[in-house]
Curated annotation (Swiss-Prot):
The record marks 119, 139 as: Important for catalytic activity. This is Fatty acid oxidation complex subunit alpha. Pathway: Lipid metabolism; fatty acid beta-oxidation. Keywords: Fatty acid metabolism, Isomerase, Lipid degradation, Lipid metabolism, Lyase, Multifunctional enzyme, NAD, Oxidoreductase. PANTHER family: TRIFUNCTIONAL ENZYME SUBUNIT ALPHA (PTHR43612), TRIFUNCTIONAL ENZYME SUBUNIT ALPHA, MITOCHONDRIAL (PTHR43612:SF3).
């Protein structure tokens, strides 16, 4: 054994060839600060070996290196800029020394090589991979950019266009694509990986492969003519500006850095990468996006822990076909759980099957599946007008009309047709689960399972625990949601549960602004362009359906009369009374016509102004700051109330439900991350300016206490140790 650290070791493999093996405790390898330091020590040992002829890097895990240890990021991001820059220089000196070894090097890459893992293998001369490879640089999705030389080496290896596509989008690619673009040199079966890598090394050692020529382009300026460079970087900057926008500085910074570094050799180019990385790491956007990643891990880990003692349902059923039922049936079948889809008429069943078939055909068109796979999946969806097969199902989700009487009747009837241990769930979006449970003989086997539309795209499923829902019931439904590829978050029961309960105060803020003379177009523009929502409130109401919102608004007002009962007729009432239900009937805040692709396209409609004039004061202008404050304060206050009342368990789960269920702008990180970034005292000052608008603007006492003591909702993070300590971590 030449060297042994906590996460890697170095040993002779055969005559003159050494192997450096990543083998961290636990299930995966991460390139954390300690591993970088250990790698530097191992390379120091190699530099002393006079009889070294070649080096092979590999992993003892199912994945090579899954990336940096993101749990370290928030503390690293608090390190002063100069210290963070010093540590990056140290880390890059390690990879430079790996790259500069006077012998050929190869990485035998299996599974994931992401982020720092990818940057590590870019420093070797050759890369051999297994078919399950996923390799790439996802850093821009975390609000930063590659910091271990990825933005320098990848463009020089692949060419600017291919590298920009991966780096700016935070992409990873599979084995075939990696081979095609030159990111790896070969793909072999897993059992032949090490032997194959040794064979390549022997060829390089014997002079059959020119490893020095392979290495040289990574040390030099990027080989691009002035015209090629102008075209590549101009196109890349335009595309990034269009897709990422101003709220995500990392992608455009990465492109500009690669452009600036193109004319320099390795050392100067790495200095430019360092100078770009450090300021990005100190942005609120990076903290928010890293926070989302960590919250996502926490939420998924919680679901895994919850379901460890239950069996995932093997057969499911959906009550009520149509778009929603068909979407749920498709998602279940697509992920391997056969499903019975029941409705009371053929027309709805046809609609549900058509929806499932349409989604599968899209997968076929994209080349994700072949005709055989399509036929196999669709054959596991069984449409029926009766309860045939219900005696075999493990879980049933009801997705009928949003009417408590209808839902109770359907659920009570279904309960008589299934096994005593079958779990029933309702896809209701607003009706309290405990109320629906009153119709059942076995309420302990019942809970809520709120999907979001469109089901195949929206990651969140709210799992609602009723007063009598058993732990096993919740666990089974969480297991099914996880199997469907969704992110389940368990909430306690109340009208609207969590997501809709906090959404409707936001709509109330919108209605009050319209009442006071604001223009709905400006509100939408501000909330989309300035705050960052994917849709403004008017457009969102048109998409959700104004009839749906009108009904849900009444349910929420009955559930929370003190805050959500309004004493005036609002824009939603006016449009509903005029039979303007949004995209579903082509008339809402806008008029809708289908474009060439069959998608609804909004157009101005003068009739809306007349309708809104009946429920609004004369038009007047509002500042962007006031629009954002009046829209967001009611929502954030309600989010805080949900935490204080135990409707949602943690700030992390609340923020993920908002991001995954409503599209809360990820660069803000969710309501609690936004609050912590803004500061609770500053938020309180802002909210107090609007207290006169009513109870929705009254800040909950718990938040007032946070403001008084300057306490955040997320646990405070300590800065990482000084850079000298990090080197020897």
């Amino acid at each position: 054994m030449l060297y042994k650290g906590d996460t890697l070791y170095l040993d002779w493999l055969e005559d003159g060839i050494a192997e450096l093996v990543f083998d961290a405790p636990g299930s995966v390898n991460k390139l954390d600060t300690a591993t970088v330091a250990s790698l530097g020590e191992a390379i120091g040992v190699l530099e002393q070996q006079s009889d070294l002829k070649g080096l092979l890097l590999r992993s003892n895990k199912a994945a090579f290196i899954v990336g940096a240890d993101i749990t370290e990021f928030l503390s690293l991001f608090l390190v002063p800029e100069e210290q963070l820059s010093q540590w990056l220089h140290f880390a890059n000196s390690v990879f430079n020394r790996l790259e500069d070894l006077p012998v050929p090097t190869i990485a035998a890459v299996n599974g994931y090589a992401l982020g720092g893992g990818c940057e590590c293998v870019l420093a070797t001369d050759y890369r051999l991979a297994t078919p399950d490879l996923r390799i790439g640089l996802p850093e821009t999705k975390l609000g930063i950019m590659p910091g271990f030389g990825g933005s320098v080496r990848m463009p020089r290896m692949l060419g600017a266009d291919s590298a920009l596509e991966i780096i700016a989008a935070g992409k990873d690619v599979g084995a075939d694509q990696a081979l095609k673009i030159g990111l790896v040199d070969g793909v072999v079966k897993a059992e032949k990986l090490v032997e194959g890598a040794k064979a390549v090394l022997r060829q390089a050692i014997n002079g059959d492969l020119d490893w020095k020529a392979k290495r040289q382009p990574k040390l030099e300026p990027l080989k691009l003519s002035k015209i090629e460079a102008t075209m590549s970087f101009t196109i890349a900057k335009g595309m990034v500006a269009q897709t990422a926008g101003k709220h995500y500085p990392a992608p455009i910074t990465a492109v500009k850095t690669i452009e600036a570094a193109a004319r320099f050799g390795r050392e100067e180019a790495l200095n430019l990468e360092n100078k770009s990385f450090v300021p990005l790491a100190h942005t609120n956007e990076a903290r928010a996006l890293v926070g989302i990643f960590l919250n996502d891990q926490y939420v998924k880990g919680k679901a895994k822990k919850l379901t460890k003692d239950v069996e995932t349902p093997k057969q499911a059923a959906v009550l009520g076909a149509g778009i929603m039922g068909g979407g749920i049936a498709y998602q279940s079948a697509w992920k391997g759980v056969p499903v019975v889809m029941k409705d009371i008429n053929d027309k709805s069943l046809t609609l549900g099957m058509t929806e499932a078939a349409k989604l599968l055909n899209k997968q076929l068109e994209r080349g994700k599946i072949d005709g055989l796979k399509l036929a196999g999946v669709i054959s596991t969806i069984h449409p029926t007008l009766d309860y045939a097969g219900f005696d075999r199902v493990d879980v049933v989700v009801e997705a009928v009309v949003e009417n408590p009487k209808v839902k109770k009747a359907v659920l009570a009837e279904t309960e008589q047709k299934v096994r005593p241990d079958t779990v029933l769930a309702s896809n209701t979006s607003t009706i309290p689960i405990s109320e629906l449970a009153n119709a059942l003989e076995r309420p302990e086997n019942f809970c809520g399972m709120h999907f979001f539309n469109p089901v195949h795209r929206m990651p969140l499923v709210e799992i609602i625990r009723g007063e009598k829902s058993s732990d096993e019931t919740i666990a089974k439904v969480v297991a099914w949601a996880s199997k469907m590829g969704k992110t389940p978050i368990v909430v306690n029961d109340c009208p609207g549960f969590f997501v809709n309960r906090v959404l409707f105060p936001y709509f109330a803020g919108f209605s009050q602004l319209l009442r006071d003379g604001a223009d709905f177009r400006k509100i939408d523009k501000v909330m989309e362009k300035q705050f960052g929502w994917p849709m403004g409130p008017a457009y969102l109401l048109d998409v959700v359906g104004i009839d749906t919102a009108h009904h849900a608004q009444a349910v929420m007002a009955a559930g929370f009369p003190q805050r959500m009962q309004k004493d005036y007729r609002d824009a939603i009432d006016a449009l509903f009374d005029a039979n303007r239900f949004g995209q579903k009937n082509g008339l809402g805040f806008w008029r809708y016509k289908e474009d060439s692709k069959g998608k609804p396209k909004k157009e101005e409609d003068a009739a809306v102004e007349d309708l809104l004039a009946e429920v609004s004061q004369p038009k007047r202008d509002f500042s962007e700051e006031e629009i954002i404050a009046r829209m967001m304060i009611p929502m954030v206050n309600e989010v805080v109330r949900c935490l204080e009342e135990g409707i949602i368990a943690t700030p992390a789960e609340a923020d993920m439900a908002l991001v995954y269920g409503l599209g809360f702008p990820p660069f803000h990180g969710g309501a609690f991350r936004w609050l912590d970034t803004l500061g609770s005292a500053k938020y309180l000052d802002m909210a107090q300016q609007y207290q006169h608008l009513g109870p929705l603007y009254e800040v909950p006492e718990g938040l007032r206490n946070k403001a008084r003591h300057n306490e955040p909702y997320y646990p405070p993070v300590e800065p990482a140790r000084p850079v000298g300590d990090l080197k020897t971590a």
